[in-house]
């Protein structure tokens, strides 16, 4: 028989930087989860993704055990790293802050496609390109 799910927690935590302080501690403490056990497991699983914020979905069961799924970093983080910028622009129509090549967009798509709402690579490229444009990053061939 399957375990009874009592809660689902969605967080974005810096890779390898999970610790009992907010937002992790209070979110897990409310559900009665062993916070240090989660922090150690999360840090171990994300050790090769340092420098990114990692979305994580934690499923909590009635016996206070948990499982968690880590996703790929947000598309905006991948775009900022590929374009070499620290943040997007406040006015993407007038101010361009960086450039991405088509190849860089496809590289981001390959990392991110599992988390997108399409399985078609061309559609995924359009989604990533749209995110880049809204940040003021130009797509060049």
From Swiss-Prot:
SMART domains: RL11. One or more lysine residues are methylated. InterPro entries: Ribosomal_uL11, Ribosomal_uL11_bac-typ, Ribosomal_uL11_C, Ribosomal_uL11_C_sf, Ribosomal_uL11_CS, Ribosomal_uL11_N, Ribosomal_uL11_N_sf. GO terms for biological process: translation. One of its GO terms (cellular component) is cytosolic large ribosomal subunit. Keywords: Methylation, Ribonucleoprotein, Ribosomal protein, RNA-binding, rRNA-binding. GO terms for molecular function: large ribosomal subunit rRNA binding; structural constituent of ribosome. Transmembrane segments: none annotated. Part of the ribosomal stalk of the 50S ribosomal subunit. Interacts with L10 and the large rRNA to form the base of the stalk. L10 forms an elongated spine to which L12 dimers bind in a sequential fashion forming a multimeric L10(L12)X complex. Forms part of the ribosomal stalk which helps the ribosome interact with GTP-bound translation factors. PANTHER family: 60S RIBOSOMAL PROTEIN L12, LARGE RIBOSOMAL SUBUNIT PROTEIN UL11M. Belongs to the universal ribosomal protein uL11 family. HAMAP family: Ribosomal_uL11. This is Large ribosomal subunit protein uL11. It comes from Campylobacter jejuni subsp. jejuni serotype O:2 (strain ATCC 700819 / NCTC 11168). The lineage of its organism: Bacteria, Pseudomonadati, Campylobacterota, Epsilonproteobacteria, Campylobacterales.
């Amino acid at each position: 028989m399957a375990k009874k799910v009592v809660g689902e927690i969605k967080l974005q935590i810096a890779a390898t930087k999970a610790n009992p302080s907010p937002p992790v501690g209070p979110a897990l403490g409310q559900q009665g989860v062993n916070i240090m056990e989660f922090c150690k497991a999360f840090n171990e699983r994300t050790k090769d993704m340092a420098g990114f914020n990692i979305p994580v979905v934690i499923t909590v069961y009635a016996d206070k055990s948990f499982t968690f799924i880590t996703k790929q970093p947000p598309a905006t983080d991948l775009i900022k790293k590929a374009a070499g910028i620290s943040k997007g622009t406040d006015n993407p129509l007038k101010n361009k802050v960086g450039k991405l090549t088509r190849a860089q967009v496809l590289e981001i798509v390959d990392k991110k496609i599992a988390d997108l709402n399409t399985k078609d690579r061309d559609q995924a490229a359009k989604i990533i390109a749209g995110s880049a444009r809204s940040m003021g990053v130009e797509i060049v061939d």
